[in-house]
Amino acid sequence: MAKHLFTSESVSEGHPDKIADQISDAVLDAILEQDPKARVACETYVKTGMVLVGGEITTSAWVDIEEITRNTVREIGYVHSDMGFDANSCAVLSAIGKQSPDINQGVDRADPLEQGAGDQGLMFGYATNETDVLMPAPITYAHRLVQRQAEVRKNGTLPWLRPDAKSQVTFQYDDGKIVGIDAVVLSTQHAEEIDQKSLQEAVMEEIIKPILPSEWLNASTKFFINPTGRFVIGGPMGDCGLTGRKIIVDTYGGMARHGGGAFSGKDPSKVDRSAAYAARYVAKNIVAAGLADRCEIQVSYAIGVAEPTSIMVETFGTEKVPSEQLTLLVREFFDLRPYGLIQMLDLLHPIYKETAAYGHFGREHFPWEKTDKAQLLRDAAGLK
């Protein structure tokens, strides 16, 4: 592979679509805390002055949707009307029904291991050894930039920052290896009083320089900081937000393929979410074991059927053992049936709200980020 550029973007927790994702997952967590077997598909829409929470939920739990919604918006930082959105005064509407019994009969089984998939679909997982968290560098650093924006906003370092922000990082590759950063874009909502020059200087010093490794920056690296010149109107006042509209931000920044299913607001019986987590777990353990430098896993399901309809392993020519052997190892060491992967990754806990901003992958405390099977895979593959 010759020289090329690759770009990924991220958005902050205050982006309208991410507000929606976090509300949906906050509702899911509150329900799972009381009822781990609940069936939850929670969708959220946000716009100026209102939040609509809808979907299909079947549970023995009772949760206060309005309180959860307001608390989530408050934690993000929308607490004054001058930001265009206020947790204390926005309307909260609820339109929630129950899961279809036609779906339910295909999922539930007397033997949990025979639990069927909640829907058909295809999911991908990916890992690469180009960063210490075995994630692509462009999405990793795009996330870290907007995480830093939230940090300096909340701790008062840059008090004129507002919650909505976006980042984008373009990396330079030569023969598949990172050689530098070509361009950085960071747009952040801000208070009226800050001027463009002061904002650009502060963002460079407090957000960009502490995050991006200096060895990847050079005289030709281009920086675009609030390139429109003004970003006062933002959040739900600037754009409406919907659950599940940032699926590439949530995953690998475009570096890997995507099956199309969103994550937030879905309980683990929905393989759109749980099987994508399991596929990441498989791919990461293969790379951590040194069996490949890059690995992409595809898995697919039929509704109501436990066994995956297919498993595919792609290593882009970086494999250290034959591809056929890798597929056999995946089938031997990973149970990718819906209930099997729920047990394997211990998914019936309220851990999902935290996933809903700054990426579902590459953050070591999530259970699908464990590399506990790497040595087993290495030994089974016969590598010294």
Swiss-Prot record:
Give residues annotated as binding L-methionine: 56, 99, 239, 270
List required co-factors: Mg(2+); K(+)
E.C. number: 2.5.1.6
Q: Name one GO cellular component term.
A: cytoplasm
- Which InterPro entries does this one have? ADOMET_SYNTHASE_CS (IPR022631), S-AdoMet_synt_C (IPR022630), S-AdoMet_synt_central (IPR022629), S-AdoMet_synt_N (IPR022628), S-AdoMet_synthetase (IPR002133), S-AdoMet_synthetase_sfam (IPR022636)
Q: Which GO terms describe its molecular function?
A: ATP binding; magnesium ion binding; methionine adenosyltransferase activity
Q: What Pfam families does the entry give? A: S-AdoMet_synt_C, S-AdoMet_synt_M, S-AdoMet_synt_N
Listed A to Z, the keywords are:
ATP-binding, Cytoplasm, Magnesium, Metal-binding, Nucleotide-binding, One-carbon metabolism, Potassium, Transferase
Which pathway is this protein assigned to?
Answer: Amino-acid biosynthesis; S-adenosyl-L-methionine biosynthesis; S-adenosyl-L-methionine from L-methionine: step 1/1
The similarity annotation says: Belongs to the AdoMet synthase family.
Listed binding positions for Mg(2+) are 17
Q: Which organism is it from?
A: Citrobacter koseri (strain ATCC BAA-895 / CDC 4225-83 / SGSC4696)
Q: How does it assemble?
A: Homotetramer; dimer of dimers.
Q: Which processes are annotated in GO (biological process)?
A: one-carbon metabolic process; S-adenosylmethionine biosynthetic process
> Which stretches of sequence are listed as region Flexible loop?
99-109
- Indicate what this protein is called per its UniProt record: S-adenosylmethionine synthase
What PANTHER family does this protein's entry cite? S-ADENOSYLMETHIONINE SYNTHETASE (PTHR11964)
Localization terms from the record: Cytoplasm
HAMAP family in alphabetical order: S_AdoMet_synth1
